């Protein structure tokens, strides 16, 4: 068994992690550390947390054998941990429940959050509605355009959504603005960070709340593959919360490979990607030391991914540590490969996965072919793809006017015009590097 005890008492994972914050936030961070230390092993707190997961979220989430995909790809059997079936449609709710419970015990009445794909924002707005807390969500304006269904969901749930116009107008900038809000309103405000980044204790705390994913898998997988665990566990990595959630309970199981899949965007050599662990260098970002995409002057560089949730120039410090000690591997999947996996999973298994999760599915399809049929791969399907349908339709050149909301405009005299009924098939993709892909991804590209 792999001996692993991280982080240390100061919040460091080797040389990574720590707490790099302004003096104005020092008291708030210390208050949070003390509160989490008090409640993280408190029986009453844990009982309430697991009750909420069971009765509000619907846990445990099932594991599904993607049998048709496995047959067609050949090689290893592919299994999916169905976090997309959670209430709100992703893994994010696991963490927001835990942090909101902590906020209430600390007497905080106002919650702020950052979001990229919108799933963390929706999960935060959801739990704030349940607990009667004020909710403000910061979201880059580019991501607001890409993820408009989730923006409306947040507003329906009573949250105030603040589009961020600074910088690249994506997740990094939303996090910056949320930090500024926290500094200005520290007395009554609790910041629910959505990933395993930020100053200590956030990376540890978010990991702990999300580790329910891997803990369930340890109990569930032997039912499918006998008295053993999968040969590989795969998850997409942006900030890295869904990956740490499934990796952490498996770290001790040395026989299981842990593989994180970063967004390679238009290719790792193109400069238009979000692969911090493969192309970044150690630096400080958003309160912790980790791998950061930066230029020769140490300035954070612009990132790109078709997936808003992976479009981030850093990564959680525990991932940086796992990479350095060799316990986890990190690879890249391009926009085009993720899109192909998105369509393939739809057509072979009837599952519409998030574009973030599709990166992990794409690598599982590659890896399975190199393995034996008696071996197994477990993929963390971190979220559902409802939020991405518009993006995928645009990228695929699909006729999206067939939406129910548009049918009344399209139909005259009871007859459906040919231009609305004979559009290109949803699954049609432009060739790799083709003009349709280049044009469609320009929304997320950086000038």
Swiss-Prot record:
Enzyme class: lyase
InterPro entries for this protein: Trp_synth_b_CS, Trp_synth_beta, Trp_synth_beta/beta-like, TrpB-like_PALP, TrpB-like_PALP_sf
Any matching Pfam family: PALP
A GO cellular component annotation in the UniProt record: cytoplasm
Entry keyword set: Amino-acid biosynthesis, Aromatic amino acid biosynthesis, Lyase, Pyridoxal phosphate, Tryptophan biosynthesis
GO molecular function list: tryptophan synthase activity
Catalytic reaction list: (1S,2R)-1-C-(indol-3-yl)glycerol 3-phosphate + L-serine = D-glyceraldehyde 3-phosphate + L-tryptophan + H2O
Coiled coil: none
Pathway: Amino-acid biosynthesis; L-tryptophan biosynthesis; L-tryptophan from chorismate: step 5/5
Region Disordered, annotated ranges: 408-447
EC number: 4.2.1.20
Names of the cofactor(s): pyridoxal 5'-phosphate
Modification N6-(pyridoxal phosphate)lysine, positions: 92
Transmembrane segments: none
Cross-referenced PROSITE patterns: TRP_SYNTHASE_BETA
Family according to the record: Belongs to the TrpB family.
Function (record text): The beta subunit is responsible for the synthesis of L-tryptophan from indole and L-serine.
Assembly and oligomerization: Tetramer of two alpha and two beta chains.
Protein name: Tryptophan synthase beta chain
Naturally occurring in which organism (per UniProt): Polaromonas sp. (strain JS666 / ATCC BAA-500)
Taxonomic classification: Bacteria, Pseudomonadati, Pseudomonadota, Betaproteobacteria, Burkholderiales
